[in-house]
Amino acid sequence: MLDAMLSGLSGLVAGFTHLHWSNLVMMCIGGILLYLGIKKDFEPLLLVPIGFGCIMVNIPLADLMEKGGFLRTIYDFGVITELFPLLIFIGIGAMTDFGPVLENPYTFILGAAGQFGIFLTLLLALALGFPYKDAVTIGIIGACDGPTVIYVASQYAQHLLGPVTVAAYSYMSLVPVLQPPIMRMLTTQKEREVVMKTHQKTVSKTTKLLFPIVITIIGGLIAPHGLPLLATIMLGNFMKESGAVARLTKASENEIANIVTLLLAISIGATMSGPVFVKPTTIIILALGLLAICLDTVCGVLFGKVLYFVTGGKINPLIGAAGISAFPMSARVVQREGQKYNKKSYLLMHAMGANAGGQVGSVMAAAVMLSVLKGMGII
């Protein structure tokens, strides 16, 4: 009887005896993510559930990520199938206004230039010895687009899902900190003071309706393996612009997006178990992700300088920094920096065009990369 009681009591301390130091480290990291989300307002909709999921999965013997476990069920249902990131893309499309990029088509080029960091980081990751699939997943952090990162990682490098997702969303929230020093370093005082004329053009409803259809068809033909990414964001935008399915549009950008974001974030946190996450490669991945986003900004601003030269000084190179997918955060950074040097400068609409172009550019970059690698037989 006494032995049975002692055995029963030993079950109460089993969790403590199986606690590994790496679990404690990850619990602390989960706590830091909660702090950043709540106190610092860094992407709270993502970092709060990711942080809590991270804490949960590092409690020993709970078996949350074992077959049939609570977190494993959610993970298999929405992440492995890529359903969650694609549903979020429909919501993003429903919330995105491509009007600014249609008013100023040249800003679409800036959105493309802002993706070069992806490919440069991919090459660097390969040079450091990462396998092809891992290098692609690390490079895609430069898309500065969480759902794209999650989609690629869930397909080709599930073991990196936690690190690359945390890197993507953390650095997205740090865009207002990361971009201004790079913008100032690469531009002159004269360039930063350029006042751009705002031409108020009216984009017809027909154009706005045709845009997502044309992009889906052309993008799908060029890079068919990335079509799910491109088609879902364009579907959301088409529903918004049509005005015929207001209930679906509202549900996509509110209820569906909120529920899926919660489940997706918890699932990502569930991949951050101590023995898997606490490795030297994680630090390298975080460093490469930071480099990718910085290189995006560098390439965008440098291309902005090219346009400044070509147009005889009519384009402010700062708007090139908005060519990433952090929408509309990056456009606001450009507006703030421009007004800091010239109170008469109003760059927001031009920057919003580049930013909207970056939304499409990041998805197209991922789609092209996946299709090229598929054609080479690498993935």
Predicted segments with their positions:
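Alpha-helical transmembrane segments
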Residues: 160-177, 288-295, 319-322
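Hydrophobic transmembrane alpha-helices of secondary-active transporters
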Residues: 33, 55-56, 81-102, 237-239, ...
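Alpha-helical membrane segments and immediately flanking helix-loop junctions
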Residues: 80-81, 90-95, 110-120, 124, ...
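Entry/N-cap segments of selected transmembrane alpha helices
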Residues: 101-122, 273-300, 351, 355
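Transmembrane helical segments that form the transport core of multi-pass membrane transport proteins
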Residues: 216-300
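Membrane-embedded hairpin module used as a gating/binding unit in multi-pass transport
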Residues: 170-244
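Interfacial helix-loop-helix linkers and transmembrane-helix boundary segments
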Residues: 38-47, 65-75, 95-110, 245-254, ...
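Intrinsically disordered, low-complexity non-transmembrane regions of multi-pass membrane transporters
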Residues: 1-18, 24, 181-210, 244-250, ...
